[in-house]
Amino acid sequence: MTDTTELQTGITRDIYGMPAFISLEVDDVRAAARWFVEALDFIELFAMPPGDEPVLIHLRRWRYQDILLRQGAAADVGTGVQLSLAATYDELDGLAARARSFDGTVVGGPADTPWNTRDLTVVSPQGLRLVFTARRPEPLRDAAFTADMNRWSQEQLPS
């Protein structure tokens, strides 16, 4: 699992080539941005044009966790599509509580997974499924699964 220490050292306002990002078409860009900022700790990096009626807002949580909200007819996100975001174990309960306080938000978890993570699933009012996933601390990990992963990694990944 990715070491999140470097990624979470403060939200950067750098403009960089994003290796991957998701665009979400929404009917109210400003309202959607407000939800991401207030419910899930994203920042509004910039809006085009600035002001109350932007057609695009660039959101960011940690480095490389970027979302573009674009003005358009609200579209069906699609069955089986989700955005997974690295998180820290200690922040999941707070994110869940904050997200639950917003109408139109569906929250599942946080819950432990068989693969040694703790996941929080949040479905935005726009229908985007976000999964915040954090590595479980050492004493809470399944030792048998860790041993399997180490063995499988040695068998399948070049050294």
Residue ranges and their predicted role:
Residues 75, 114-115, 135-139:
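A short acidic/small-residue loop/turn micro-motif
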Residues 14-17, 23-66:
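Core segments of cupin and vicinal oxygen chelate
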Residues 1-33, 82-85, 134-159:
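N-terminal beta-strand motif that seeds the catalytic metal site of vicinal oxygen chelate
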Residues 26-31, 61, 83-129:
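Vicinal oxygen chelate
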Residues 67-70, 131:
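Conserved beta-strand in the GNAT
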Residues 70-89:
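Helix-adjacent hinge/juxtasegments
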Residues 51-55, 77, 113-118:
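Short acidic/glycine-enriched loop/turn segments that link adjacent beta-strands
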